[in-house]
Amino acid sequence: QVADLIALARRLQEHPEPHALAGKILGLLFMNPSLRTLSSFQAGMMRLGGSSFVVTPGQGTWQVETRTGAVMNAGAAEHVREAIPVLASYCDALGIRSFAEGKDLAADIAETQFRLMADLCNKPFVNMESAMNHPCQALADWKTMDDLAVPRTGRFVLSWVYHPRALPLAVPAATLHMAAQRGMEVVVLRPEGYALPEQVMAKARAAAKVSGGCVGETSDRASALAGAHVLYAKEWGSPECYGDPEAETR
């Protein structure tokens, strides 16, 4: 399936089809900010002859409540249980971006909130970043490596880097799984206390087992970078301090 998607992307890149999605509408619900994801999806629809609409709750539209069973007497005028079916009725496919709440690691790993929203949509559904996944970005990274002729069995280093604030786990989790699924020798380089959750590592190891790749982790920079074909730098918050920003800064 990944190979087919990349082949399609390459064909459209070489032989554009400006009317392929004529008359089609893509709805884009951004519960969280975006630059590249928002602009790339809109540009993609325009290049294929389709159109899109963007809803960012609280910016020109009502705030949207996501909590199940919430009493609607506070700031939000809409609930996702009504909002998503309505938005889906206006489009041919719906993309949703909704980050992790960052409070309960187990709930975020289970994608509890995102699965609820996905279940409310009766149209083709696109994950534009959830608590633990950013599949479209990972797919684009895979294509970029193919375009640059990075060996399928090459060494891929996912390295933690400093950021002033703790960032979500979605991108590192998606990137790790992508490289493992591609069959690469994947190394997660991170300081003590920043090991990715075992569920994330186990999923990547399972993908590597199928693809013929391997997944490891270390805190030793020299050994991790030796012979690397790709260095992917990304910050993520410490799972040990999940839901506690003050502990993270200490």
How would you label these PLM feature ranges?
Residues 1-43:
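Positively charged, low-complexity intrinsically disordered leader regions
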Residues 51-52, 58-59, 93, 124, ...:
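Residue-level detector of anion-binding/catalytic polar loops
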Residues 31-51, 146-233:
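Glycine-rich phosphate/diphosphate-binding loop of Rossmann-like nucleotide-binding domains
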Residues 57-60, 99-101, 130-131, 191-193, ...:
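Short, ordered loop/turn segments at secondary-structure junctions
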Residues 25, 30-89:
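Active-site cofactor/substrate anionic-group-binding motifs, chiefly glycine-
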Residues 90-91, 95-100, 218-250:
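Glycine-rich phosphate-binding loop
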Residues 78, 82-85, 92-178:
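Anion-binding alpha/beta catalytic cores of soluble intermediary-metabolism enzymes, centered on
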Residues 70-74, 101-111, 245-250:
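Short, flexible/disordered intra-domain loops and linkers
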